[in-house]
Structures are given as C-alpha cells and as structure tokens.
C-alpha cells in the first residue's frame, strides 16, 4: 500500500507531512519552505502559479491572484460572510447558477474547490518529489466547525487534484494527535485553541491510555468558520487607509495596486508587532495625484493593533465557554492548552487564552505544522503503520429534518461521536397524503429556516391513510468523514429513498469530472511548459558557449563559416523568444551543423594546450634532476 499523505489545507498557508517509519515528517516544498502560501495566481500568459511565486506577483496582478479561498468553499453567495468578503477582496466573487459563491477569473467562472485543488496539487507534488513515487491518497484536515457542504467541497477539491481523500479530519483533533502521540501523557484532557488565517475552532479532547493504546476522544467542539488572521489584517489595512486619507486626502481603496501593497505591508506589520512594541509601515510611491507622488509612512504600536482587534479576540472566547459547557467540564478540568494556527503567535491572543483557562498554553507545539503532522499520523493509522491509536471525533452541529410548523427536529445532536447512525419514526400531516418531502437541516436553531439547508428529497408511493397513521422511518447515518447519508422508508409499503447529502448546492458529479479532466490537461500543459523552459535553457547555454568559441577561434575561423554561424545564432536567438519547443530544437540543430568547423578548431586548440602542458611538465622534470642525499644527524657534545 502506498503512503497516505497528511495535508493541512489552510486559509493562509498549507502544509504537507508523511509518516517516516513511526515519526511524522513535514516536507519542504520546491522553494525550500515547510509551509506554502495558499495563494493561486492566473497570469496573463496562461500560467498558473501557486504559493510563493503567486504571492510575489500579487502586486502587479491583484484581480487574478486568489487568496483565502477556504473562506468561500462550500458557501452560498448570499451568505452574510461571503457578502462581507465581496466588498473587501481584490478579486471578483460571483454567484454561480446553483447559488454557490464562485469566482470570476479573467472572465471564466471557477468554483472554490477547483482553485483549492491547485494548492493540493502542489502539496501532492512536494510529497512525490520527496518519496520518488506517485501519491494518490491523502488525509485532509478541515476546521472542526465546517458544515457538511464545506466538508464535501473539500473532498471535491481533493478529487480534482487527483487525490483519493481517505479521511477528512478536524484540525484541532489532528493537532491533538500530533501533541499526544509522542508523549507519555497518561490520561489527560486538553483544549486545542485553533486560530488560523480564516477560521477559528476550539475542541476539548480527552486522551486516554489503556494497555498501551491511546484513545483520542473529542468531547466537544465549537468555533467560527469566518474568524481568523485575514480579519486581523483587514482591521490593520482599514486603519492605514483611514490614516493616509486624513493625511493626504486620498482614498487608496480605489487603487487595487496600492491596496495589494498595503495588504502585504499590513500583514508584515502585524507579524512584527508580535515581537516588537512598534513598527513603521513605509511604502514609498504608494500613489500619486496632480501634485506628484505620495508616500506612506505610518507608525503603528502594538497597543494600537490590540485596540483595533480586541473585539475579534473576544469573539473567540465565547465558543470556549460553550465547548466547556457541552463537554460538561470546568476550566480546572483542563490539563493542557495547545495553541494552533499562525494568529496564536499574537501576545494578546496568548494572554486572553491564558486568562480564560488560568494556565499558560504549551509552547512545545509548532502552530504551523501540528495539524499536518496529525493528518499524517491519521494516514499512518489507516495504512496500519501507526498502531494502538484510536480517534473518536464528533459532529460539530446538530442534524435533523423540518417537521410540521417549520420546526427543526434533531435526529443527531451536536458533539455526537462519529461514525453514528440514528433512526426516528415520523408520520403524515394530511389525510391520504401519498408523498412526503424530507428536508435535511444542520444547525442549533428551533426554526427550520434559521438553520443550514443540506438538501431535500421526496418519498413517494405512501398508501392513502388518515393523517398520523403512516409510519415513515427516517435514518441519519454519519460516516467517519462527518458526511451524512439519509434514508426514509415507509414501513407499510416498504418503499425507501436514500441520498448522500451533497448539500443543496455544491458541485455535481459531471462538474467534478470535468474539473478532474481540466486538471489532468493542465498537468500535461505544465509538463510541456517545463520541457519548453529546459529546452530554452539548453538553447541559451549553446548561444553563450558558441559565441565564446567564435571569439577564441579568432582569425582561425574562415569568414564563410563565421557568417553561417552568426546567421544560425541570430535564428536561434529569435526562436528562443517564442513558445515553440520544436522550433528551438531545430535552430539548435542548425547551429550545431554550422559550427562543425568551429568545433574542429576548438578541439585543435584543446589538443595544443594539452601538448603544451605535457612539454612544460617534461621540462620541469629535467630541472628536477636532483640527487637525494643522506644526512647524518650531528649531536652537539655536551
């Protein structure tokens, strides 16, 4: 069985790890970094860039450089959180035909899973380069508070990237695996506070050790899938924009290029303020007006940043209380607090968490890598490489159906350990009703319309009977990925309907297959592009070396040959500016043929140099005709 890799598909950064024997290893990407920015850029010449190369060109291509796509995955365009992003993101978010949030990239409609798949492909390639073999299976992490649609969309992204997603696991649970696996901790209850680039989770997890087997049981989870470092960045950007407007009277929001530079500077300043008390945001030539160029130079203190984001940090505290309450525990029952996600490096976040739990969070867990390591461990559990580990996760939100009066009736309560199955018998609301609609919901509200609609289906063929008489058994079955399968059966007629919830939105099978084919076609074009670059490099090398040899040959090279070579050099130079690999190779061949006389001269010169070297050695040898003498040591007489 091949390796199952572990991928932390993050909002801001992503990370990939594998099991190396019994140890998890985080892999470095092609740029030599252990994490990869979750940024995808579509350039004017049709190239797709991922990670650091995409980030570097963002300033000149803001509309087609996509980041924080995880905030859109599995979401509806009309969602309040999506509408908030529509107004602040430099790229274009649009409503798809099915009501989902999609993106408009250079006039082409693209689904978030399709874009996230580009990041997953880079993670896959990183693992393949390290292992030296193809990788087809992965464990991918998601925020614990992701709903069914968001989990399904993440699995779709994996498929588009050419990966069979063996398991979707929750990020805090993965971090707990990374923390607890190599520690002789005995029985402990830990809180994992995960504040990443775009999402926030809190999970209360119990680690039990019985006869050498460790059980990781999630007791409760809570969170906010639209709270993270990107929101902190936005506060800083807004502050800088307002300060500049006060100072210069210019609103930078109308200038996408300036806003992209400002985004980078704001993120950098935020990071610097985790270790420094003050920083300068210095952006020369940020914009210009009739009076000339304008420069930004604004001092920002740590206290100022804290005042800007205090409410965001406080927003993360309420879910902590709910999670503890759901787990039936108090703060004193928590043995360890683990911080995950880059935003937890902010001193104010650490201080608030320490105040809430009454203890300092542990510092021995890498907030950027723990989740990917945990995913790799879960991959090892699935392949059998990691033994004596049992993971018991939970469903983050209640699941149920809409019943008479527009009420949500829960069949599976939140924080139920998964996989799980639950059935309940319902009946008809009208006399002689021959069909019922099963409307599947996810959420905690009593009114059905206030919850997330996951989908609906009809059960037909119910025998006519007075209302309340037919017995319709509805069964909810959640698999280990937290994905829901629903069936409804009329106990009288035996008629049954089943669906796997694909959400009322999401990608259908045809769309996924098309995206998989597109990804494969892109892989082919990527390979061709790589081959073109290699051929170009060979052509450049040939140009340089031939010119050098022409120079060295001097008058020894006949004029006719020199003219032919110059002509072939010029033709190759022109071909190198184009995109045709075959044309470059043909011109290289022509240059090689035109340079035959030059090669002969070069070989003669080389032979003469060799001969000259040999003569010099021989002369030296003659001079070295020295007689070895024997010496006798004469000791001084004392």
Swiss-Prot record:
Biased composition (Low complexity): 602-620
UniProt entry tagged with the keyword 4Fe-4S: no
Residues recorded as bearing Phosphothreonine in the entry: 199
Induction: By stress conditions e.g. heat shock.
Record CDD domains: ASKHA_NBD_HSP70_DnaK-like (cd10234)
Keyword Phosphoprotein assigned: yes
InterPro entries: ATPase_NBD, Chaperone_DnaK, Heat_shock_70_CS, HSP70_C_sf, HSP70_peptide-bd_sf, Hsp_70_fam
PROSITE patterns reported for this sequence: HSP70_1, HSP70_2, HSP70_3
GO molecular function: ATP binding; ATP-dependent protein folding chaperone; unfolded protein binding
Annotated segments matching region Disordered: 602-638
A Pfam family that the UniProt record links to this protein: HSP70
Keywords from the named record: ATP-binding, Chaperone, Nucleotide-binding, Phosphoprotein, Stress response
Primary role: Acts as a chaperone.
Family recorded in the similarity comment: Belongs to the heat shock protein 70 family.
Database matches in PANTHER family: HEAT SHOCK PROTEIN 70KDA
Annotated protein name in UniProt: Chaperone protein DnaK
Annotated organism of origin: Citrobacter koseri (strain ATCC BAA-895 / CDC 4225-83 / SGSC4696)
Taxonomic lineage: Bacteria, Pseudomonadati, Pseudomonadota, Gammaproteobacteria, Enterobacterales
